[in-house]
């Protein structure tokens, strides 16, 4: 791997998790639930981790039946391991082709406990692979979904907690700032003393909020500038700095649609289906207004209804995500002067000069906008809306974002709405989980060195690099056999695959205390003032964003912190990134059979690699520039191939609600391509190294084990409400169909499991892109 060296300040945009350049991720970015996948709780901040007072009540709150069941499960698991160990002793001399090491016995136990062998694998492979896991893992309290990603994140959280609570003299100043931030979050006594005062004072400084008191400042432009730059809210539209898609060597101001409090426009527009959520959202708004001193509910509710109606008007002009997938069509570069003509409701030059100060912006400043029609319509909406309502809406954006940093009453309001929105049940999660999550989201690179030193073996980078090379080789082998692609485009595609840059574990700069301290030099965390620390961070992170404008993008910037259980592909950098957090079981274990590692981390690598060639990634060349580098004949052939997948996944449904095959197309292409590349890489490994020993008692070949390992990565459960939210917001298909969809397209899977032609897992017509 090439050296990772981001200059301290330019690295900070990604180090803070604040970069907004496009990326394609392995899984949903939220590992737990948030009120919104965007503006409401940015940086992935999750509200549902907050404990009422203490996590110690969790066991006590269990019924006697629940306690007995927990004990029984533990005893059964111990018995299973003991039986497998006994089998290992009994057959050790009989079957040299069977792996009987402690690691093999342990992983076999885990696989068996997750399976449901009563299900026909040719009928429903997801239930066959995950049926046991699903029965043993109901959605935990405080969550609306649970799976292997969540489980691994919990493990990482526990490590981070220990590191934050046990300071050492050798930590850097940046690491100490993360510890101060965490401890302020944990100081519930001080938070309860302050109650709503910090936010109420902030609202007063902004000129008031008609919902809680006199509104004395009729200055729309000033308020918009302050809430955008100092508190990183995005009412009406979002403004950020990122690599120019058509000139990836330079950063540019970018403007896009934004401003909804709920996760998707669908919640506002499909009122009958989402009546419960809309009612719950309004009640939540009213409750926060009361907690902030609004007094009489009869006076608050009509004004909050007006805000909700305004958000509904925003939803009406917001473009659905599935119609924004062709980036060549939605990309428009204009000057600041042209933007003023396009959306005259905003005084753009004063706005941009204020939020990007001290950088000077003039009328010729290039700006990329992703939907001209939206900006025209939002400008009209602003000009035709009462100024008091506009101010109420902007302050509501601020309240949504910051109320979770206040006392327990606000947490209770959050949790009540979470139950309506996501089906999240009562919470008995300890406070530290909320604080670890928030600290990691905001200061994840500051605490990154602690996590890396505690968890990441240095040779893991070289091991992961080798896996990536094997997957890339397999992908290029498949690329050479495609019949629908012309030779010229194929050659360019291979050059792009060769040029993909690998980032593994962590960026090297975080391990240099001096460089890390430079990154966070301008951020100060103060003891015992949690709300203040969060507000300082928002202001600090925007200053870092503004600082990027006149600097070139840095290939070595990261958009995920080391503990994250995820991975991503960046099209403007043509790079794939695998944080240390995902380089663990069940994705990778050095003592596990290669079949499982290729089915785990191998498919993850293949997934991200294939994103370079999905319906959006394929539009970018090897240098990360958005341009038409395919011949027209191959473009048309690609579209025909992908339509098969759109139709296939659109026929899947959850609780009677269909999957959006077009919105999920990119992820489905990556899932299918990643599985194919990983399987081929495993076959190449076997040819080179010989067949490995099989696991005991499973009765499965290693090729079957590869597919089983892949499927068990996606074992998960969700509440009906969370499933609905995922279907309308998430670009990934539901876990069940990530397994069934990919495997039913794999002829190798059907061959190894001997699935009869026409069976559900071996349909007569299979979709294949890569």
From Swiss-Prot:
All isoforms are expressed in umbilical vein endothelial cells, polynuclear neutrophils, fibroblasts, atrium cardiomyocytes and ventricles. Isoforms A, B and C are also expressed in placenta, lung, heart, adrenal gland and phaeochromocytoma; isoforms A and C in liver, testis and small intestine; isoform B, C and D in endothelial cells and umbilical vein smooth muscle cells; isoforms C and D in saphenous vein cells, and isoform C in kidney. InterPro entries: MetalloPept_cat_dom_sf, Peptidase_M13, Peptidase_M13_C, Peptidase_M13_dom_2, Peptidase_M13_N. GO terms for cellular component: early endosome; endosome; endosome membrane; external side of plasma membrane; extracellular exosome; lysosomal membrane; membrane; perinuclear region of cytoplasm. The gene is ECE1. Homodimer; disulfide-linked. Interacts with PPP1R16B. Interacts with TSPAN8; this interaction recruits the endothelin converting enzyme ECE1 to tetraspanin-enriched microdomains and positively modulates its enzymatic activity. Its main location: membrane. The chain crosses the membrane at residues 69-89. This is Endothelin-converting enzyme 1. Glycans are attached at residues 166, 187, 210, 270, 316, 362, 383, 539, 632, 651. Disulfide bonds join 99-104, 122-755, 130-715, 185-435, 644-767. The modification Phosphothreonine is found at residue 25. Residues 90-770 are extracellular.
